[in-house]
Amino acid sequence: MSRRSGVRLVALAVLAAVVAGCASVPAESEGGGRVAETICEFSREAEPEGLSGITRIGGSRYNSVDDRGGFLHELEIVQDESGEIVSCEVKRSVRLQGRTDLEGCAYDPFDGRIWVSDEHDTTICAFDPETGREVSRAAVPEVYRKNVVANKSFEGLTISPDGYRMYVTNEDTLKCDGRVADDLRGGTVRIQEFVRAGKGAKWEPTRQFRYQTDRVEGSRFSGLAISGVAGLCALEDGTLLVLEREMSQKSPLFPSFRARLYEIDLNADSNEPQKRLVWEENTMFANYEGICLGPKLKSGMRSLILVSDGGGNADENLLVLALFGEK
């Protein structure tokens, strides 16, 4: 969604296990679930604005896309051993051929290409990150193109760490699935799975999951109530992290945002997986839209990076969280 009140990157540290000397797992995570908590906040330069998706390409290097000019930006995000972000610098920007409203992006571990989801024309295409030239595209089921609601098409995109699975989702309910989310009820989005045999093989659409989003909780003033899925992140164990984002009018002057991170198990024998809340925050002007895996830290934690696309005059921040209770 093209709303920019500042850009935030969020690093989440993921504990594979609780080891001696580490903080104890919060009580809420007992029983195997994940729980995230804040570590620190970091402020970055204002440009480029409108970042809406992010993916790690190796080391401290990341690619991010914007939803205004169709650019792919290479970022260097440096973290210290504890996971705190030390710096964030834009290294280069490349315009992607024929793109205008980019929302999600995912690094292909087989060939280094970058796959992106475009909200404008409901496509998933691969690009050469050096030239910006389109080199491939995935076959998208017709149900999406025929039923998307304006400005609520493809948002989150992720490729599994092993490179064999890709997932994409629409932001809010398709026309054929009912009403979009509002302050009375949540919506239903479809998470589409693609699989391939290996390097050079085409993505084939396979399973489709129905995911229930939250209703808008903060709409005190009329005219603004939006809730939906903004980002996806596939983990090694078959779990999918789902980033939900709400925008509502809590005052007569300014909108505010709320972010929630859920986990769903795609190994379960159901096309309607149950979701479990692992983190949420009333983020004011920070509009979280993208999420990706980051590096492992010295403590054994795995970081995640989230990017926030707002719209207006908010600060550009980086926020570090820790995610406890890894399965």
Where are the regions a protein language model picked out?
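Secretory targeting and sorting signals
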Residues: R4-P26
